[in-house]
């Protein structure tokens, strides 16, 4: 029977320009129909960012910075998000030209992503376990077929359905008093491929690490319609 949701853990590696690849731990909750929580933690500096969809909308939470932004967004409907297994399945369904090969108990799909115009990453290779029919890994490539994002699924549990109360954003912020800043942007494309949220006409231009009360914090600077 169809479950009411899932929980999964994965690792994600992003290969940027010339630097070292960045490694992240990813944890996803999904409860049908529309509750999502994605937690992404950078392994080197332990900075965590969350994107949460609940009844009130879509929120991006950076617990350590005590910041929560609310978006007007259809996320994740419009996006290929490789760590959301429902979206991954949708990618495969929508790409009529997807090619499947079979090898060593695995199905390997070569398929298009659905938001290449925004990301510049048009294709992906999805490896599915033949027995469980669950994805084992996803590699997302640029137009030169160079690997840019690699996701390895460590554990996928289809029997977990978190209660909707568990998706309350207040739970994830380190300070109960926090106010939610509304990012009043009609957001066409909320992407959570860390380093951060990128929305229309806004891009991450700077990332500073500052020492504050002995704590290391990452300050993200945006440029665009809204500057924070």
Kindly give the residue locations of the regions a language model identified.
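N-terminal leader/targeting segments and the immediate start of mature chains
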Residues: 1-35, 45, 93-102, 178-184, ...
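Short, surface-exposed charged micro-motifs
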Residues: 27, 48-50, 97-99, 123-127, ...
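Short, solvent-exposed recognition patches
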Residues: 27, 175-228
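Short beta-strand segments that buttress and anchor functional surface loops
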Residues: 10-13, 37-41, 108-116, 138-141, ...
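Short, solvent-exposed coil/turn segments at beta-strand boundaries
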Residues: 2-5, 29-36, 52-57, 104, ...
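An acidic-aromatic
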Residues: 27-82, 142-152
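Flexible, processing/modification-adjacent segments and terminal tails
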Residues: 54-122, 162, 176-193
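Gly/Pro-enriched, hydrophobic low-complexity segments
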Residues: 102-174
